């Protein structure tokens, strides 16, 4: 919640979602570790960026953010880089297994009456009514679906859905990332981030709920529709 620009929807849902994950984990039965995290800085320029992230987080409602020095960095995570001179310490950070969360959310949705339509991509959207009182008809190979509210959670297809619905026009940039999974190394207990850039949060070292460590991820730009697996970048 400290990275998104204040006032955006992402800023609002990041902070609130992080707050709720402990409750969701208990209610839905997935693993969740709240370890805290650090964004590491190595010079005065990085420190200025960390201070901006701290201010963002304060406005966005992220609790207990602070800038710490090298002694505190290595007290919190002894395996952090010895060259790190500053860090943004965020004690509320946690991590999950995203596959477990997706399955748990799906099961909970089914238990609450949600119907899933498989192999039913949206091919067209008809919009009727005014902007404030719209009605949507979604055409799919499995039949039409009518609704009053339409949530665009289509991932790489989000721009197409938005266009068909007559909503915001935007362009998707496809990226493919490689993740290194370490199955024999001792666990790094908290996520360690570099200072983010305008296009990426960089390569992150983090523990997992299963006890191992992952290094994630590259962000190679790919052509739209490219879903093939690449061995390396």
At which residue positions do the language-model features occur?
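Dinucleotide-binding Rossmann-like beta1-alpha1 core, especially the glycine-rich loop
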Residues: 1-76, 85, 202-204
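Generic structural signal for well-ordered, non-membrane alpha-helical segments
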Residues: 10, 14-17, 46, 50, ...
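Active-site substrate-recognition segment that forms the wall
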Residues: 23, 28-33, 144-145, 149-233
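Helix-loop-beta segment of a Rossmann-like dinucleotide-binding subdomain
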Residues: 29-39, 64-67, 74-112, 135, ...
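Short strand-connecting beta-turns/loops that link adjacent beta-strands
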Residues: 45, 127-133, 187, 210
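Alpha-helical scaffold segments in soluble metabolic enzymes
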Residues: 52, 104, 108, 160, ...
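General beta-strand structural signal in soluble alpha/beta enzymes
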Residues: 66-69, 116-118, 152, 215
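Helical element adjacent to the flavin cofactor pocket in flavoenzyme catalytic cores
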Residues: 88-149, 157
